[in-house]
Amino acid sequence: MAPGCKTELRSVTNGQSNQPSNEGDAIKVFVRIRPPAERSGSADGEQNLCLSVLSSTSLRLHSNPEPKTFTFDHVADVDTTQESVFATVAKSIVESCMSGYNGTIFAYGQTGSGKTFTMMGPSESDNFSHNLRGVIPRSFEYLFSLIDREKEKAGAGKSFLCKCSFIEIYNEQIYDLLDSASAGLYLREHIKKGVFVVGAVEQVVTSAAEAYQVLSGGWRNRRVASTSMNRESSRSHAVFTITIESMEKSNEIVNIRTSLLNLVDLAGSERQKDTHAEGMRLKEAGNINRSLSCLGQVITALVDVGNGKQRHVCYRDSKLTFLLRDSLGGNAKTAIIANVHPGSRCFGETLSTLNFAQRAKLIKNKAVVNEDTQGNVSQLQAEVKRLKEQLAELASGQTPPESFLTRDKKKTNYMEYFQEAMLFFKKSEQEKKSLIEKVTQLEDLTLKKEKFIQSNKMIVKFREDQIIRLEKLHKESRGGFLPEEQDRLLSELRNEIQTLREQIEHHPRVAKYAMENHSLREENRRLRLLEPVKRAQEMDAQTIAKLEKAFSEISGMEKSDKNQQGFSPKAQKEPCLFANTEKLKAQLLQIQTELNNSKQEYEEFKELTRKRQLELESELQSLQKANLNLENLLEATKACKRQEVSQLNKIHAETLKIITTPTKAYQLHSRPVPKLSPEMGSFGSLYTQNSSILDNDILNEPVPPEMNEQAFEAISEELRTVQEQMSALQAKLDEEEHKNLKLQQHVDKLEHHSTQMQELFSSERIDWTKQQEELLSQLNVLEKQLQETQTKNDFLKSEVHDLRVVLHSADKELSSVKLEYSSFKTNQEKEFNKLSERHMHVQLQLDNLRLENEKLLESKACLQDSYDNLQEIMKFEIDQLSRNLQNFKKENETLKSDLNNLMELLEAEKERNNKLSLQFEEDKENSSKEILKVLEAVRQEKQKETAKCEQQMAKVQKLEESLLATEKVISSLEKSRDSDKKVVADLMNQIQELRTSVCEKTETIDTLKQELKDINCKYNSALVDREESRVLIKKQEVDILDLKETLRLRILSEDIERDMLCEDLAHATEQLNMLTEASKKHSGLLQSAQEELTKKEALIQELQHKLNQKKEEVEQKKNEYNFKMRQLEHVMDSAAEDPQSPKTPPHFQTHLAKLLETQEQEIEDGRASKTSLEHLVTKLNEDREVKNAEILRMKEQLREMENLRLESQQLIEKNWLLQGQLDDIKRQKENSDQNHPDNQQLKNEQEESIKERLAKSKIVEEMLKMKADLEEVQSALYNKEMECLRMTDEVERTQTLESKAFQEKEQLRSKLEEMYEERERTSQEMEMLRKQVECLAEENGKLVGHQNLHQKIQYVVRLKKENVRLAEETEKLRAENVFLKEKKRSES
């Protein structure tokens, strides 16, 4: 922002303080180029600058191929002072905070770009009193100076409260810097407050010094570390917040304005290759860069939204953006100080910072005054009326602005929509989480199922491979198994066992049950958190509160009825009380029914969940037993397979033996082969006789191949048939084992279930016995209550009879009417007294108004005194400024004296140099050319120093000229002050004269107004009295008729209620009898149920015994089967050993068929027994369900009994209420018998009213005369009001003059601050010059010290060598730098 635009901006903010800002909505961006540090000049790369400032609003970045230009609100170069930065950036925001707007100032830039210096100042010294202090201390000073000014202007009518909080965001965690012991804090959002930090300490401050103490105390707790780019680098974002609350009172109306001033020091963005960060520093840098990138994303999104695009602004991605949400596109006036490093080494970070600042400049905030108006209702109504009149006046000239109500409605609608959206978002998040959990569970299930399928496939493959391998071995090998093959078979069997174990572990049913268990637990938790349960609890609390409130109201009404004596108020209150009690009873009944329903639902749900849990537990135990059985089966299968392998080995060996031995089923050469038939018995004997003769021939004769092949084929066919039979039997056996396993699981499940049911039944028995005892006790109590109610009913009947006798007396009605008339007369007298009291009250109000007028005059005098005080303060400040100027002059004089001393030193040095030059001229012939060159270089340096001294002298002259200019300005200000004093004195004299005249005329007006008011009051009171008397007479007549009707209706209603109560009592007794009978029936049913349960338990035990028997039978059958298999093996062995023939014996097949038939019969018997057991189990389950239904029905009946008991209690309470009402009616009747009014008094009062009318007509005539006088007074008043308006205009003019003077004073103060900063800068430069002069003096001393010519030559040569060496080193370093740059380019 240009300096010339400062005053314009301030005027805009002042003019828009009481309405939403329009022009100042855009974020103000201020770019500051880092001031040079002491060590910056020595660093390589900083000598080449990449920035140049074109004007106060634009800068140029020297980029390739073309330079880029950026324009901002203000651009500060290297020589800009801290005061100018504060004046352009912070002043306007602090002023807007004073007028009720929120304000934010934050510094942005890379690490080491001067953010902390800009916001705080130098870190070495005390920032609050230092001339180079930053924006935060200066904003404290300016804020509290504005507060003091407002307090002086408003006096006691305006008060301020300032609170400070200081937090930091470190590694995306919020910490309170004012409380070092605090842990991580949290951000919350409020409709009115906005985003705020929960639990942050707020300290009240009353001055700038206290605020700075709070800041420095928190700053010491901030996390700071050193990096290669910065000695003290901020490792966190610091946010210092000042809450300003101003309260202004005017005519009992309180205007409260609250505003927030956020002063933010952001941590700088950094690159790891530049800072060389490692470990914790690297993590900190990552978190800093992440939060700053979120800030950049938010700004780009806000720019897109401003351009009309629909984008989501991700405030919640970072704690920093969420905290500064109102500052970025919200309710705040924001200024950004973009700090930039001018060195070419930081070109990338500088470019990104400038781009960020350019985007931020496009954001527009919507700042609104945070104001709340409170006060008396009458005062607020008057204010509203005044504002409406102003609006009507404005409407005649221009269109009215948009109403605030529509805005508020829009805001409220927006907030409602936002809350709904947030609720939907939370619900969707919860649903999403639950769905993700379900998906993960389903994925686990699918994985387990896939594993199960794979394991099954592997088992099938293993078995097929094993069968194929055994067949091959059987066909190919002639001997036993090799050891390698046996090992391989064992390994394969082990693999198969492992797959079976994995199959058991990843069984899908187990996973499914686990998932169902998890889902049921979640459902249980969800149902516990259901709204009906919570609502029932809330309804209980509400009903208790309502009942207590109703009881307190009824007791209060009864006390008031006892204290009062009249009949009419009781007659009005009693029906109201009756209606209220009826309503409360109805509400009670509804609430109790709802409670009972909710409790019933909750109990049912509990029972269902318990049953479900029991079933799941039983299933789990059955599955565990099934797993054990499977493991046993695995071990059995292992043993069976080992036996089968050994048997196959034996069979193979025997078959080989049979094949290799020679047979006797053929004859050699031409001998026929004998057939094995039953007809060959005789031939067999002959054959056996000649067998000894033929043995030698058979043994010596070779076996023909055809016979070998036939024998082999026969054996192979027989083996196949046997194998097929074996496989079929094995399949049947597997099926039977699988069925047995299922039966075993089912039996285990039933056993576990039966144990659980036994436990349940035992617990329910105990509960039923307890309930039975409770019911019996309740029945006894109810019987006692019934007896009590019967006695009370008899008592009530006697009372009702007495009341009927009393009610028949009609003469008492006349006495009640007379009583009412007398009460009317007393009321009329009371009202007359009230009117007189009102009259007195009005007079007191008039006196109070006079006192207020006097107070206003006193306040005007106080204002005059405050104005005088302000003038004195102005004088004091001008004196202080003049003293400061004098001090400044003295300091300038001291500087001049220092300069003179320096000049004298320079002259002395010149003289020394002249002497040296004369010596060198004498020794010119002997000296070399090199020494002359060195001397010339020394002379050039001296000339440079002299030129610098001359520049300093020129600067000093400029400072003197600026001092003269400031003195002229001060003299002109003094002259203007004197002229203003004269004008103010004249104005004050005129004001005093006008005050005296106004006071005199106001007194006359007040007296006239009072007389007029008195007359009006009298006239109005007379008219009101007359009308009220008429209305009262009519009301009394109507009330008498109403009372008669109400009495008649009351009697009828009481008769009806009495009859209803009798019927209710009879019904209650019947219900009690029914309940007793029902309880007896229930006890009988319970006993029968217990007996049935015992029977069922006996049945279950019998079934268990049968199951055990069946198990034993199955085991016996297994043993028989094994025995028969052994017999089969024995038969096979005998067939193999028999040398008669290669074929099987004829009885083998028949024996096998018989065995198979017996096995089939046994299997069918097992199936029949299984079906019978299943039928028995289903019957038992049905019986159990029937018993459960009966138990539930009995519970419902018990609940109905409890409801009946509650209804009987309610009837008793009704009886008590009716008895109380009857007592009230008796008392009213007794009171009505005592008083009798007189009708004659009405006539007397009417005559008095006629007389009053005549008197009032006379008063009206006098009033007309007074009105004419009043009009004259009003015209005079109008003239005085015009004079008052002129006076107010003059006061406003004086206020504008005062504000101008304040602004000029602030400008002078800022100029003085700038001059102080320049003075410090010049002093630093002077110190640098002194050091350089001292260095030159030392060098000269060295040169002077070397008087010997040979020593001088050696010294010069040494210097030359050092210079050459340094030049070579610099060239090497430059070459290495160029090489590294080229290497980086080639790598990129």
From Swiss-Prot:
Keyword Magnesium: no
Residues in Kinesin motor domain copies: 26-363
Positions of region (Disordered): 1-25, 1228-1250
Residue spans of biased composition, Polar residues class: 10-22
Residues modified as Phosphothreonine: T399
Primary residence: cytoplasm
GO molecular function, one term: plus-end-directed microtubule motor activity
Keyword Nucleus: no
Subcellular location: Cytoplasm; Cytoplasm, Cytoskeleton, Spindle
Protein residues bound to ATP: G109, Q110, T111, G112, S113, G114, K115, T116
Family of the protein in this entry: Belongs to the TRAFAC class myosin-kinesin ATPase superfamily. Kinesin family. KLP2 subfamily.
Protein purpose: Plus-end directed kinesin-like motor enzyme involved in mitotic spindle assembly.
Subunit and partners: Interacts with MKI67 and TPX2.
UniProt name for this protein: Kinesin-like protein KIF15
Organism lineage: Eukaryota, Metazoa, Chordata, Craniata, Vertebrata
